[in-house]
């Protein structure tokens, strides 16, 4: 509870993965299921049509708008630190900078619809890459858009789905180490890079990982994993 409270206040916990360590049958999955259930009870606000649940505050600049929003609406400046996704930035250019053209929707996270909640499991070294977390280009759209166009991208990765939500990473340390790298920047910096050459995608959510003790010991003893 203290972890979630401090993370919500923007303290150091918001830059950390919530990691559950324990033996098989110790209740790790039960805690994860309970958190996902609770997450579905409270709605989130996002820009209508955003494939990564862009928060409306991403349209404001903390330096230019921070004082006004705090004075007139009581919105703390720390809430304005989320970046705008490439998709939202493209829409902003199409609207000639008029943010009133954006619509805001109130959405309830859903496990079944994978809105704000997603589950990731480790795969084989040969068939799992970072696209399972960050998405990839949709080949079918390349007839209409350039490869580095935000509208040609498939935001199917777990990190894309869980902005403002919760991602459960089952047996995290069984995954190839290359797959885990986006988690570092997502938690530490609040954004991560897609597989194509456009700007970073926003992340403001909870990453919940769990594994048993033997997997953790093996992972920790490998000096190459020190950053994690």
Language model segments and positions:
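Conserved ASCE/P-loop NTPase catalytic core
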Residues: 1-228
């Amino acid at each position: 509870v203290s972890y979630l409270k401090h993370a919500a206040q923007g303290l150091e916990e918001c830059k950390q993965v919530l990691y559950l360590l324990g033996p098989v049958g110790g209740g790790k999955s039960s805690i994860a299921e309970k958190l996902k259930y609770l997450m579905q009870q409270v709605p989130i606000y996002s820009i209508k049509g955003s494939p990564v649940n862009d928060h409306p505050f991403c349209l404001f600049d903390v330096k230019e708008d921070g004082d006004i929003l705090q004075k007139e609406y009581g919105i703390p400046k720390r809430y304005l630190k989320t970046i705008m996704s490439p998709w939202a930035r493209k829409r902003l250019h199409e609207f000639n900078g008029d943010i009133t053209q954006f619509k805001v929707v109130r959405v309830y996270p859903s496990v079944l619809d994978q809105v704000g909640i997603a589950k990731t499991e480790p795969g084989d070294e040969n068939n799992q890459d970072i696209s399972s977390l960050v998405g990839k280009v949709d080949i079918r759209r390349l007839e209409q858009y350039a490869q580095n166009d935000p509208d040609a991208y498939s935001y199917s990765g777990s990190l894309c789905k869980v902005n403002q939500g919760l991602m459960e990473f089952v047996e995290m340390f069984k995954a190839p180490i290359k797959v885990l790298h986006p988690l570092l920047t997502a938690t530490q910096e609040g954004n991560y890079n897609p597989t194509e050459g456009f700007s970073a995608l926003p992340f403001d959510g909870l990453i919940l990982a769990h594994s048993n003790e033997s997997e953790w010991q093996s992972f920790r003893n490998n000096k190459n994993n020190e950053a994690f």
